Amino acid sequence: MTNPQGPPNDPSPWARPGDQGPLARPPASSEASTGRLRPGEPAGHIQEPVSPPTQPEQQPQTEHLAASHAHTRRSGRQAAHQAWDPTGLLAAQEEEPAAVKTKRRARRDPLTVFLVLIIVFSLVLAGLIGGELYARHVANSKVAQAVACVVKDQATASFGVAPLLLWQVATRHFTNISVETAGNQIRDAKGMQIKLTIQNVRLKNTPNSRGTIGALDATITWSSEGIKESVQNAIPILGAFVTSSVVTHPADGTVELKGLLNNITAKPIVAGKGLELQIINFNTLGFSLPKETVQSTLNEFTSSLTKNYPLGIHADSVQVTSTGVVSRFSTRDAAIPTGIQNPCFSHI
């Protein structure tokens, strides 16, 4: 049985979308929702879907927001991927400068820290030692210069080992100072040497003093040869004839001055604040020389040598030895004169 031929231009019923047979795909939900049947209309008639009115003014904003959200999501995914990418972390660590790695390792290395502390301690100790040596050099020079100015001879000074001189300079309190002269002379007394021990010095500038000295003890040694030269200088014309040699007698504490024409025996004694050579025996050969004249000359000479020391220094005792005369001087709680009162102390 054959199908009747339709008009040549009539499309085949198999090509119609609306009549696809029982095996055709059912219409989509959107199509079913938009096409509704109305009463009075034929069953094959499907109403065209009515599109909602467009709002052109909101479409650009919606598209912009959608594009912004899409860009944000892509950026977030890329950032998360980069943040959790172990390969990127390894690459960043490999690119870290070697100096920074070495510095971090040095901070964590106990040996390096210990060596740094040792170096710092050594530098501080070296600076302290250098400052101590410099302070001692300056202080020794000033004290020696003052003593040399008083005794008219070269002098050397030294401060005690403890406490540190830097601390003594800071507190202006000096505990122990030792001074020794060269032994050439003290003023005009030839062959005389002095050794000083100075304690408890406190420097404090006042109109009348530079400070105080708690205690000063001096040991003065006068050699036999020095006594001879000193007496010869004290008697300008007859000195060489009066004293050609000096012999000491420790047993009786006398000094014998032998000359070409005389023989004088004198005893060193403490007189006032200094020393004197008191004539015990005086013998002349061939000429007459008054004993009083010789005694007066010796007194003036020894007075100029051993009296009127600064700081109130005075003689305490004297002793005759086999090599000369040893005397001891001292002072307590003495005021240090200013540079105006005594130029020898101007640098203290």
Curated annotation (Swiss-Prot):
Cell location: Cell membrane
InterPro entries registered for this protein in UniProt: DUF2993
Keywords of the record: Cell membrane, Membrane, Transmembrane, Transmembrane helix
The keyword Transmembrane helix is annotated on this UniProt entry: yes
Biased segments, Pro residues type: 1-11
Superkingdom of source: Bacteria
Transmembrane segments: 111-131, 235-255
Signal peptide: none
Key word Membrane present: yes
Membrane-topology annotation of the record: Multi-pass membrane protein
Region Disordered: start-end pairs: 1-83
GO cellular component term, pick one: plasma membrane
Comment field (misc): Was identified as a high-confidence drug target.
Protein's recorded name: Uncharacterized protein Rv0479c
